Amino acid sequence: STAIYGSKSANGVIVVETVRPEPGRLRVSYSGNFTYQTPDLTDYNLMNASEKLNFERLAGRYTAKSIYDSQDELDALYYSRLKEVRRGVNTYWLSEPLRAVLNHSHNLYIDGGDNAMVYGIGVAYSNDDGVMKGSDRETMSGNIKLSYRAKSLIFTNDFNIDVTNWDREPVDFFTFAQANPYYRKYNDDGTVPELLEDMNVAGTTIYNPLYLYNIVNTNKTGEMSLRNNFSIVWRFLNAFQLRG
């Protein structure tokens, strides 16, 4: 059995043959599966805008630590953020890139034949979207199997094709998790600002993850695989078989 089926079959194998369809009639089978997924953010316990700003102040974020730091600029940065907090800004970023999704998969198989020839044709499709917006995967596959029996010989050909396409989210979840709650998502006119803050301290540029998310970009990957297996089985003495 090792020579025929590989090293994992050293202790022996059990060969199972499916029930042949009734001669002259087609047999059709279908299966489908639907799943609903929704993100769960209950484990995240983040500081609100006021708590985060006060934490940064106590940690010395707005205190000059060297001659290269400008205390005036740090004070201006702190009070501009405090102004946002006092006007009611308290942004929850985590839910922005997430969504609830309904995924589905389908399998259709048709087979038929007679005592000598058996054939089967199968197609499958699955749509697997992630809870991150823009994270999608689509899989399609097909299969054609032919089996011909001539006395003690069985000729089998099995052809398979698989096509997979997937998209990745343009901005990762961690980028949204890092965005501070005292930043506004939108301008007063409803537009999405490119930067979360006009002030640029110590060369740090803070981009709005929503703006990055809405930039037209493509992050697609696809692959296709083809497989064809042909085998001949010779059964003899009612107890032995050779496979090639």
Model-inferred region functions:
Residues 1-8, 38-42:
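N-terminal plug
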